[in-house]
């Protein structure tokens, strides 16, 4: 576009230049017969009275000659013109100014900004700077993902809700007091100490049949070990049909207090087949038989019939497969945690809430529940934005997903990421390296990065990440010198100056990044190398554990998950009971058959 504009400007200037050429030709025409000795003095006289033009027989000839010379000059200029980009021959990459970018993107008040580095902030009102607030944070162990990014942004206490994936519970412990003082309602899904957790029941958020399908799909995906492949998917498919039948039954037929995974396990135990040769119906079979009498087209029946079409041996194997998937719900602690719901996910876009999901950093056994939580949270927030609040949540929701690789998300997460901005939802994806992202989303990882307008690199040791950051920085044009020396009788010494290109940072230079610094990429801006944010300089640090503000203690024990009491009875105080006299009669096989027939 700039090239076309420059071309048009050159043509306009060339046409305008014809006017002074014609004017000059008319002025000097009366003097051309005397040659150059007369032309030069006449020019001085002519310029004293520039509009005194005398037409003569040589006027036309003089004008044409000057136009010819002018045209030749234009032609020579155009023939030698090249598309030069001085000092950019091998690349135009360069470092941006942290202060200049901060001035462009920061907003007032200071709390309504996302802290990227020590000197760069991005306002939370994305409509002003037209950048989404999705951020990819990449840093190895010890690079400061929690200290230099997660904690500072929670300390902002902005007018938004926060969903924090918190391995070990460190973030909640350090900033919980500050958030509580700032008016946040703190909720905790604690999978480390479940007796301290708020309850979370996925059944509460099942609005329609599609939600039930998503729940079962997510459950099976998140309980499948990474890298495992089933040679025969039949058993998982059949087990999912049985689970769908049970959940559909509870959703439409059971009272609310029975709609939970503990009841699913009760129903599954009621389907147990003790003897493969015994054709008697199980209690679960009887339950669905009653349902068939009342509503033969019930959706739960459709799935139950599909499951029940095999032999007794096959049904038993399907039950074992499903029981293995759900075995964690046999634990009293998890059954109690999922028996009711206290999280109220839909309200997160309506009032300031901080929801912490605490997961052990050395045990992923219960991470599947966090995966279900995230899937349902996206569904609830999107539904609330689209159908209740006119397209955008009144309170923005930001998800800080520390150790992102530890949870399983929907396969279409890249699509979810691309449409959440307009609804007031944003995500910070926090990884140790890009290899983790590639392992999770083999085909969509580049799309996920592309949907994050900010990329913050904190340092690390993973080679493919070094290469990616180096390529993202681009190449710059530099000056180089080459030296030559020849010895002998006619020895000489020479120095040559030339330009060449090199990466702004080579992969090995990325690896050697000073641990005090971070590299920040913002869409449409030059990259910035700046100091990581110093948490001790934040004005709210005094209210956190890092500023000696005390450690936050959450969740007094509210649920006695398993209680065993010893009852001491004084046997002497027990009244004697009169026992009725009982007689017994031994029957023959023939007599027994007559009684039972």
Summary of predicted features, one role per range:
Residues 1-143, 147-152, 195, 475, ...:
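Basic- and hydrophobic-enriched, low-structure N-terminal and domain-boundary segments
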Residues 36, 40-47, 105, 486-490, ...:
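Extended hydrophobic/Leu-rich segments
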Residues 128-425, 440, 444, 508-529, ...:
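P-loop NTPase motor domains
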Residues 155-157, 179, 437, 472, ...:
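Alpha-helix termini
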Residues 203, 532-539:
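A short, sequence-level motif marking secondary-structure junctions
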Residues 359, 363, 403, 431, ...:
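Short loop or secondary-structure boundary microenvironments that flank
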Residues 417-419, 423-519:
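Conserved ATP-driven motor cores of ASCE-family P-loop NTPases powering translocation/secretion/packaging/pilus
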Residues 472, 535-537, 546-551:
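Short intrinsically disordered coil segments
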